Each structure stands twice: as structure tokens, then as C-alpha cells.
Amino acid sequence: MFLSNIPGDVRANEQLNLIAMHTIWMREHNRVARSLLFNNPAWLDDRLYEEARRIVIAEYQHIIFNEWLPLIVGTDLMQKFGLFPLTSGHSDLYLDTFDPRVSNEFATAAFRFGHSLIPSTFSKIAGTGARSGSSGSLNMKDIFFKPREFMVNKGNFFQK
């Protein structure tokens, strides 16, 4: 039996982490869109989509700046450059005219270090969160572009 996600980008089925992240963020987008529709029933689909997209991007950026980036660059640099999110209130620093693109040099060289953060082995876990043991391990090389394991196991994996 062949099971697959049908994402907008074929790379989404490349490995379990990507499948999980794409699924989580797609579901969050849809959850936000439903909430916006409930509170704004006159909004058209395009507006619902774009507003939900804007909110989910902000959520993603908050996680990046609050949890991931401090681990990568360290808290000293985060503090030095004022990169930590506010603990209360809001910032007026957002500029919709700011160009958020990444340079080709950064995208093709410097940021590729992130590939070294991808684990080579995943352990299956039970619905309770308990590991299934060594027989329940999956090697990245065996599941590359094979989303079946994710679909069959409903995303129950633990990175080693």
C-alpha cells in the first residue's frame, strides 16, 4: 500500500521531520483560518487565507527567535543585538516594506549547516509517549522520500 502526503512542495515528503513540520503548520494555518472565519463571517477566502498566513508566520518567527536561535547563536549575541522577543506588550518595529529575502550566499552556504542538525535515526513511540524499543527504530537512509512510515504510525516518532 502506498501512502503519501500531497504537499505543495515535493521536498515536504523528504524526511520525517519535514513531513511533521509541514503537517503541523498546515493544520495550525487551518485552525487559525477557522477561528478567523468564526469571528469574521463576511471575510472572503483570500482574506482568511492571507490573515491566517500572517498570524502563523508570526507564530513561527516567535518560536525561531525565542527557542531555536538562542541555541544556535547563544544568549549573549541574542541580548547584544536585541533579538529576544518581548516578554509582554508588543513591538512597533514591524516594517511591511522591509525586504525579508535571504541572500543566495547565505542560503546556499552558511545556512546549510542546519542539515547537520537532522538526526540519522528515529525511534517509534507509542501513543503514550513511551519508546517502542530498538526494534522500533528507523534509519533516515531507509525512509528518505518514503512518507508511509509517518502516515502509518500517525507521526509517533522520537529523534535519537
Give the predicted meaning of each segment.
Residues 1-160:
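Long, well-ordered alpha/beta core segments of mature domains
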